[in-house]
Amino acid sequence: MRHFDSMEILNELLKFQSITPDDDGAFNYISMILNDFEEINIDKNGVKNVIFRKTFGPGVHICFAGHIDVVKPGIGWDSDPFDPLQKDGFIYARGAQDMKSAVASMICAVSGVQNFNGTISLLLTSDEEGDAVFGTREALKFLQSRGELPDFAVVGEPTCETVFGDTIKVGRRGSINGILRINGIQGHVAYPNKCVNPVHILASKFANFAGHDFDNGNDFFEPSKLVVVDIRGGMQVCNVTPSDVSVMFNVRNSNLTDANDIKNFINDLYKDCDFDLNLKVSSNPFLTDKNSKIVQKLSQSVQKISGVCPVFTTGGGTSDARYFAEFNVDVAEFGVINDRLHAVNERVSVNEVQKLTEIYKDLIENF
């Protein structure tokens, strides 16, 4: 079996225009490299999920996970976003950081395993950047139905902030979206006594609403803050008061706050008003015990290869790691620096990719 270098793999992966949920042939390329692994295809509603798996012994099952899809490149690039350009120690292309670099490192690491007292798998999806409804979660549901869920998982999201090796994600905040609509009575602006202006009602308590912290956070989570993202009301005319005004907001919640806490807060704040509230839980917070074997072993490998002692955090947006937590799989996330995510001229350091590959290899060898 020919050995594939992680940089060679990355260079090829970056050529695929795998905009969600189209893999554009990337899975065929990966299948060619991992041709001695069992391959399980789980396709649903146009989303492709592939599990590559090899069992070496009766021990634990470690799953490396990631996504092959990327967001649209947009305009303004200095080079073709799907024709990787290597320059000054970096590779420029869409998906370089998020997250084909980690996928390439994972493929290289697992393909070279000769001895391991357990099972090694690689779970990849073509829908993480989109709705992610039929992606990683669907693959895990399939494994659960067969009693084959992994014991531990590593997700290759780009976690590092300023220096490679500085951050391991051991959890993520949840995400709750909400729309608050204050109802009033429309009327002529010259006769305010005959109207009920919902904007005035909203404004009277808005300082206590916008930016509200539902908790004080803890060692791993920042406070759960209500962030207003949009306000709409009226007909954009100067002589009619609106019949209602709507506020769209989001709460990235810790494990100390849930949807009921948000509902109770708003019900109390606007208890004397006519309003409607709609809340949607997009994802739940999770936290992997810092003493979990996957966290400790990953931390040791990061320190050994990068020379940096990583901190354990839960910041940033949501990721597919939450689905592993949902299925009670201990999960940690580690990848390259994340300073160009979804940006024009996205790039990744060649040195980081090579070190990331060594970290994944070391984790397997010493688990």
Swiss-Prot record:
Cofactor note: Binds 2 Zn(2+) or Co(2+) ions per subunit.
Transmembrane regions: none
InterPro entries found in the cross-reference section: ArgE/DapE_CS (IPR001261), Bact_exopeptidase_dim_dom (IPR036264), DapE_proteobac (IPR005941), Peptidase_M20 (IPR002933), Peptidase_M20_dimer (IPR011650), Peptidase_M20A (IPR050072)
Residues noted as binding Zn(2+) 1 in the record, renumbered to the chain: H67, D98, E157
GO terms classed as biological process: diaminopimelate biosynthetic process; L-arginine biosynthetic process; lysine biosynthetic process via diaminopimelate
Ligand binding (Zn(2+) 2): D98, E129, H342
MF-aspect GO terms: acetylornithine deacetylase activity; metal ion binding; succinyl-diaminopimelate desuccinylase activity
Active site: D69, E128 (proton acceptor)
Pathway of action: Amino-acid biosynthesis; L-lysine biosynthesis via DAP pathway; LL-2,6-diaminopimelate from (S)-tetrahydrodipicolinate (succinylase route): step 3/3
Swiss-Prot/TrEMBL catalytic activity: N-succinyl-(2S,6S)-2,6-diaminopimelate + H2O = (2S,6S)-2,6-diaminopimelate + succinate
EC number(s) given by UniProt: 3.5.1.18
Record function comment: Catalyzes the hydrolysis of N-succinyl-L,L-diaminopimelic acid (SDAP), forming succinate and LL-2,6-diaminopimelate (DAP), an intermediate involved in the bacterial biosynthesis of lysine and meso-diaminopimelic acid, an essential component of bacterial cell walls.
Family under the similarity heading: Belongs to the peptidase M20A family. DapE subfamily.
NCBIfam families hit by this protein: dapE_proteo (TIGR01246), PRK13009.1 (NF009557)
Protein name: Succinyl-diaminopimelate desuccinylase
Organism encoding this protein: Campylobacter hominis (strain ATCC BAA-381 / DSM 21671 / CCUG 45161 / LMG 19568 / NCTC 13146 / CH001A)
Source taxonomy: Bacteria, Pseudomonadati, Campylobacterota, Epsilonproteobacteria, Campylobacterales
